[in-house]
Amino acid sequence: MASLSPEIMDKGVIAASAGNHAQGVALSAKTLNTSAIIVMPKTTPEIKVKSVRGLGGEVILYGDNYDEASKRAEEIAKEKGLMIIPPYDDPHVVAGQGTVGMEILQQSKKDIDAIFVPVGGGLSLIHI
């Protein structure tokens, strides 16, 4: 998101996610002083919804699954002129997550025996 133009950032961003991506977009938006709408399936666990809201994201619960939420996010993006922040199929998103493994090694004060990675879409896993 840091690579987006000031014009885009002034409008805010939108994403569809049921978990980690939603939290990442909300936190990034807060850090970069813009707004984020996160469309999440109605089946999303309440703890994840609360986390996104706690990070400043506006949550819209829609649909029974990710595909339905994603389609709604696309509709809202067109209506409001917002940039969609995709969870995995974007070179900037992939590059941003590409530093995860390196950051773990740099920040660890001890040798690492194992790393446990939560897997939703799987993008974080490929960078470890």
Can you annotate each of these PLM segments?
Residues M1-I126:
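PLP-dependent amino-acid enzyme catalytic core
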